[in-house]
Amino acid sequence: MSYIPHSEEETKEILSKLGLESLEDLFSHIPKELFAKDFSFPEPKSEEELRRIFERACEDTELPLYFIGAGAYDRIIPSVIWQILSRGEFLTPYTPYQAEASQGTLQAIFEYQSLICELTGMDVANASMYDGASALAEAVLMARAIKGKGDTVVLSKALNPLYRRTVKTYLRGYEDKIVEVPYTEEGTTDLNNLEEVLKESEVHALAVQYPNFFGFVEPLKEIGELCKKYEVPFVVFVDPIALSILKPPAEFGADIVVGEGQQMGIPLSFGGPYVGFFATKKEHVRKMPGRLVGMGEDIEGKRAFTLVLQTREQHIRRERATSNICTNQNLMALANLLYMVLLGKEGMKKVAVQSLSKALYFKKELMKKGFEEVFTGKHLWEFPLRHESLKAIYRKLLKEKIVLGLPLDRFYEDLKNTTLIAVTEKRTKEEIDSVLALL
């Protein structure tokens, strides 16, 4: 057992002083028949396997089986994350307003910002936003400020429809035209249509999702080249887990990268609280919304963390402020930080690869049951499938506490009888096979 403090040399020294030759001699006074011959311990289990055992033992706590994503994903959360976050130092303090306050909290936020930059490939990240949707909307406003002129915002129709709705809400006070670029048979943004829009309109912001709402990997290289050609600020909404196996948007010329951090250590919780992350290029930092923690030195030359470039309406004239966000999601951001630190690059890559391999298996078996592909593009762990009897299948599985994806006709009229299915590393082969057995 690795936690016994005595080394082999120390054990020999103690036995020598006691006049004994072995540990067995130390217990020679105990009758041999009292010694256990075989403990019959089961094989060791992971934390997640133990959690499932206890859940099954408590019948009243049986949870639905989720194969639904669309921006919120049922992933494994190491229990140590919320053990740490439950400490009073993290759980109860309010976000520090004074620049010098709470060095521990400020350092934690600084470390979070650093890892978000590493994940996205960008130069600077802020202390977090309310959620992914508000981060995207703020990114569009920032892109408008970067461009300085124009009257059109372009959104891919393959971008999460709820996020698009949030952007439209934020833009209600402006006189912008919002153009939604359609998707192709591959399930990705139509590049020909996009170039026509960029050519014919005064565009001051373009936003796409990577991978997109349907789970397909957008051609960021080509989109980035179009943005550079027509001098349009490029906003990319990303999946943080996907970035462990995909090239970061920074390599394709993204000006602003945002995303939803729920997948990294935050439970589903009826839709919140979540956390949005926000990163950009160094040259745009003065137009970035939200709080920003920097590292410097105090008057004694010691390292000190402080809030910097505070351009909220509480600090400067309202009309010159970059945002009016009143607080950040500091506790949720720390959950993201702990998740990234605990899993590391390789751990997050394993999460992504497991999710992808299970998704491919489930998709292949579902297609044997009469489901059909809707698009031809390359996806990760989320994909849409069509079935003529989808509503009947959906109702049947709901009775068994199984949620088979999100019906897409709620958002897209041309996607009748289509469901958007997501498979995470949390789903086991036994669970997947149990669903297939019901079809």
Swiss-Prot record:
Tree of life domain: Bacteria
Keyword DNA-binding applies: no
InterPro entries according to UniProt: GcvPA, GDC-P_N, GDC_P, PyrdxlP-dep_Trfase, PyrdxlP-dep_Trfase_major, PyrdxlP-dep_Trfase_small
GO terms for biological process, alphabetical: glycine decarboxylation via glycine cleavage system; nucleoside metabolic process
Sorted UniProt keywords: Oxidoreductase
Enzyme category, top tier: oxidoreductase
Keyword Oxidoreductase annotated: yes
Alphabetical list of CDD domains matching this protein: GDC-P
MF annotations from Gene Ontology: glycine dehydrogenase (decarboxylating) activity
Record field: catalytic activity: N(6)-[(R)-lipoyl]-L-lysyl-[glycine-cleavage complex H protein] + glycine + H(+) = N(6)-[(R)-S(8)-aminomethyldihydrolipoyl]-L-lysyl-[glycine-cleavage complex H protein] + CO2
EC number: 1.4.4.2
Family: Belongs to the GcvP family. N-terminal subunit subfamily.
HAMAP family registered for this protein in UniProt: GcvPA
Subunit structure: The glycine cleavage system is composed of four proteins: P, T, L and H. In this organism, the P 'protein' is a heterodimer of two subunits.
Function text: The glycine cleavage system catalyzes the degradation of glycine. The P protein binds the alpha-amino group of glycine through its pyridoxal phosphate cofactor; CO(2) is released and the remaining methylamine moiety is then transferred to the lipoamide cofactor of the H protein.
Name of the protein described by the UniProt record: Probable glycine dehydrogenase (decarboxylating) subunit 1
Species this chain originates from: Aquifex aeolicus (strain VF5)
Source taxonomy: Bacteria, Pseudomonadati, Aquificota, Aquificia, Aquificales
